[in-house]
Amino acid sequence: MAAKEVIFGDAARAKMVEGVNVLANAVKVTLGPKGRNVVLERSFGAPTVTKDGVSVAKEIELKDKLQNMGAQLVKEVASRTSDNAGDGTTTATVLAQAIVREGMKYVAAGMNPMDLKRGIDKAVAATVEQLAAIAKPCTTTKEIAQVGSISANSDASIGERIAEAMEKVGKEGVITVEDGKSLNDELDIVEGMQFDRGYLSPYFINNPEKQTAILENPFILLCDKKISNIRDLLPVLEQVAKAGRPLLIIAEDIEGEALATLVVNNIRGILKTCAVKAPGFGDRRKAMLEDIAILSGGQVVAEEVGLTLEKITLEELGQAKRIEIGKENTTLIDGNGQAVTIEARVKQIRAQIEEATSDYDREKLQERVAKLAGGVAVIKVGAATEVEMKEKKARVEDALHATRAAVEEGIVPGGGVALLRARAAIKIKGDNPDQEAGIRIVLRAMEEPLRMIVQNAGEEASVVVAKVLEGKGNFGYNAANGTYGDMVEMGVLDPAKVTRSALQNAASIAALLLTTDCMVAEVAEDKAAGGMGDMGGMGGMGGMGGMM
């Protein structure tokens, strides 16, 4: 085991803060409508240009192990916020840095870090309550477009595309983002269905870049039993191979020699296949399989209907124009089902929703209706170059996450105003002076997102913050055009979920940093350049001349 270096107290915290600052300073330049780009080196190909906080954070790895620990903890803030809300990663990083910076002053002054943490937690809980009170539902297409535009770095066309997609497929529908073929963004609405099961083996992947298996014009075999014996599958595999089309198998499970044979056939190119577990459990699984059968115009192989794998023909298999299978999701696009049958199935499920007694059952039934009736919207991102397309695609994905978050928990005024208004309404007290200091740390940190937005726009932060604090309600500063006014009317909106997640995750990690008193890291080994030094003995080789 390698020797470890152990550092205590202020020395440990100072190193960690250095790491926090390096990462946060790199990320926060991207904040706001006038935020700058960050260029990331790639080991091959063109560098990536991004304004996405979490993409920048993930690239940073510091040489100094102690500094790197601090940087990695703040990276966790960005990653967790991205996972929870899909956006707000830069805001979360800015808040974390501010809480750490303010908190370290109090720790250095001798205050109890644990009480500071309790104060921070109290202030965050109170702020979350205030944000929920400020938030208003996001219902109109215009509001959805505004949220999308802000999240896509003030690109109105992206916001409009997302709002249009949501309007077409409903808030429950599936929206995916793809590379476009032209210079402009396009929106395609495709009838389809998505369920949360992915490929059973990574050997089915045929698109390494997206890590997905894509089947064009496939047959679909639906079975409500476990398949482990390849002999059961042989008749249907032979029929599909003769037809020269791919096959997707959706069953309770596929294992053993059946799965191995499918994988081998796929790798050798004899038969393009993919195997997926059926979604849901128990009765819900049977119902979901029936939904897929109706959508694809096939039949479920089940004992109840007298169908077995040996007897099934191509006519009883479902069909679709295209199927995309990822690690966790399968999207079935343009199934071969009859519109009348699908409509009848939707009516049947809606009747079940009326009779459902539990909220959980109702929610699951509504999901099924959305999957049958909603369809899939595909936003095709257009750009002049591949580098621009990658950057734009990342922004579209961010904006999509933000709009979903807005629909879920409502919207608050953007541009850092929501945190300032929530701060003004907080009237809590700590149990002792150290907890009071913890509350003050959070209240001060809540100014930081606005300060950073203003700074990136090239204005004087203190002047703008003071003016915004004088105002009330939605009054704030629009950095895009340098004007003051009602943020909601100007269309500068943030999803409440994004602001809440950013603050909670930032405070959680920052409080851990403040309460750290010891760091343990491997001692860096001096890699001596030696080894070649003994070659001096080779001088005797001169005598080799006599060999001639």
From Swiss-Prot:
Keywords: ATP-binding, Chaperone, Cytoplasm, Isomerase, Nucleotide-binding. ATP binds at residues 30-33, 51, 87-91, 415, 478-480, 494. InterPro entries: Chaperonin_Cpn60_CS, Cpn60/GroEL, Cpn60/GroEL/TCP-1, GroEL-like_apical_dom_sf, GROEL-like_equatorial_sf, TCP-1-like_intermed_sf. Its main location: cytoplasm. It comes from the Bacteria. GO terms for biological process: protein refolding. One of its GO terms (molecular function) is ATP-dependent protein folding chaperone. Disulfide bonds: none annotated. Pfam families: Cpn60_TCP1 (PF00118). It catalyses: ATP + H2O + a folded polypeptide = ADP + phosphate + an unfolded polypeptide. It is found in: Cytoplasm. One of its GO terms (cellular component) is cytoplasm. It is an enzyme of class 5 (isomerase). The keyword Lipid biosynthesis does not apply. Its EC number is 5.6.1.7. Forms a cylinder of 14 subunits composed of two heptameric rings stacked back-to-back. Interacts with the co-chaperonin GroES. PANTHER family: 60 KDA HEAT SHOCK PROTEIN, MITOCHONDRIAL (PTHR45633). Belongs to the chaperonin (HSP60) family. Together with its co-chaperonin GroES, plays an essential role in assisting protein folding. The GroEL-GroES system forms a nano-cage that allows encapsulation of the non-native substrate proteins and provides a physical environment optimized to promote and accelerate protein folding. This is Chaperonin GroEL. It comes from Janthinobacterium sp. (strain Marseille). The gene is groEL.
